[in-house]
Amino acid sequence: MSNQTAQQPVLCIDLKKNRIRIHKITLHMLGDPDFIQLLVNPKSGLLAIKGTIPEDHLGLKVHKELLTDGNCYEIHSKELMQTLQRVRSDWKNNQSYRIYGKCNESSGIALFAMKDIVQMEDALAHD
């Protein structure tokens, strides 16, 4: 990974396992929140991750002790994956994708353009 991509928020979308992996660096860039929201704008094709408060009914608790190998926070949701595939019909079932985004640290939000996906190599997708 180049130094430039090491400084960008990143998430992986795994359609085979119906999960989104939010890399630890992304959470760190957001201020290591205890709760996050995952937002999808179908019209603009954007995904957003932002820190939130425990009282937010749309918030997801980040169980930091369960971060996969200390690197990723995982969200498993078949319904979410189906929604993302309706937005991006070119995404293939049983494939994994990586998206690099941009972080506005002062606003506590990371934005990802779904058009900027990179299909992951099969060897990397079989973790």
Mark where each language-model region is.
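Short, surface-exposed charged micro-motifs
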Residues: 10-12, 35-39, 100
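Mature exported/compartmentalized surface modules and terminal targeting/interaction regions
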Residues: 1-2, 7, 42-43, 50-127
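A broad, low-specificity signal marking well-ordered, structured residues that form hydrophobic/aromatic
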Residues: 11, 20, 36, 47, ...
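Acidic (E/D-rich), amphipathic helical modules within compact regulatory domains
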Residues: 27-46
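Short, charged/polar N-terminal "headpieces" of proteins
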Residues: 1-29
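Short beta-strand-centered segments at strand-helix junctions
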Residues: 19-31, 75-84
